[in-house]
Amino acid sequence: MTEDTQPLFHTHTHDGWTHTHMAREAQTAPAEDLRIRGVVLPDGEERELWVHDGVLVEGPLSGARTLADGCWIIPGLVDAHNHIGLDAHGAVGTETADEQARTEAKTGTLLIRDAGSPSDTHWIDDRDDLPRVIRAGRHIARPKRYIRNYAAEVDPENLVAEVDRQARSGDGWVKLVGDWIDRDEGDLAPLWPADIAQAAIDRAHELGARVTAHCFSEEAPAQLVDAGIDCIEHGTGLTDETIATMVERGVGLVPTLINIETFPSIAAQADGKFPKYAAHMRHLHAHRHETIAKAWDAGVPIYAGTDAGGTIKHGLIAS
């Protein structure tokens, strides 16, 4: 693309996990037909692509301008765990959210699975220069058991109702906080009783939504996978037994390895007051590659996600 044009994206497919997009040039004059020739990834086949009005079409097209020849052609990248409209302190304004989304587009991300945000970003759907977004509504957590200003905070008896609410405000996903530090126990612990978690997941499924959950520990993902959850975020505590059940049920995993690199600094902050938690976080970090490799080798569906937003900067999916 030339420097004075902006990318616009046309959605071709959507199954809840993936989109396929085609970038085109934004022009005030009628869009010209384009020809692109190169090696198309991931197949590695050299092909000619023809673009009419920003959309891939069957060619050839008479009079089409060659936009690129002898190049590599790749689809837009997908960030399966991202947070548009969120920073370290909670919800951000539209201007900041716009900047976050533009950063993702400039670095190649054309589809974002937003894994929880306190901001309403549906205005992005009307912007052709920004990535498409599949939203999970707002995180759902218990009071004082997650990052301040991030989540809809409810007690367990109100979880099903909150899942109902977030399922209706999202785009087919609901995001639970599966575990967090329990300050009374001094370590990671699940947020939800198993029976209530299962009832909440069942309600989401009744509404046609899938459920995913933030999980660092061993206990929470085991409980939630048994309860019928569709995906696990982070997954540093996955055991062999949990992995086997995930494979059997087709449960996805988004490891967010960029986020997991922060575990040592989190542990260092907890050393004095919560030594058990600090040691646990260091253990999870030390075994992160082994754990994710086991899930991969077993056949768990794994998706790339950065956890951008909050304290992780945007535009890192290629990393």
Predicted ranges, named:
Residues 7-21, 94-209, 251-260, 266:
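Divalent-metal coordination cores built from histidine and acidic residues
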Residues 75-87, 204, 211-216, 232:
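Histidine-centered catalytic micro-motifs
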Residues 85-87, 118-123, 141-143, 180-183, ...:
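Active-site environment of divalent metal-dependent phosphoester hydrolases
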Residues 206, 285-319:
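His/Asp/Glu-enriched, well-ordered alpha-helical/loop segment
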Residues 226-231, 247-253, 271-272, 299-301:
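Glycine-enriched alpha-helix->loop->beta-strand junction motifs that scaffold or abut catalytic
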Residues 256, 263-280:
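Active-site loop ensemble at the mouth of alpha/beta enzyme cores that anchors a bound cofactor
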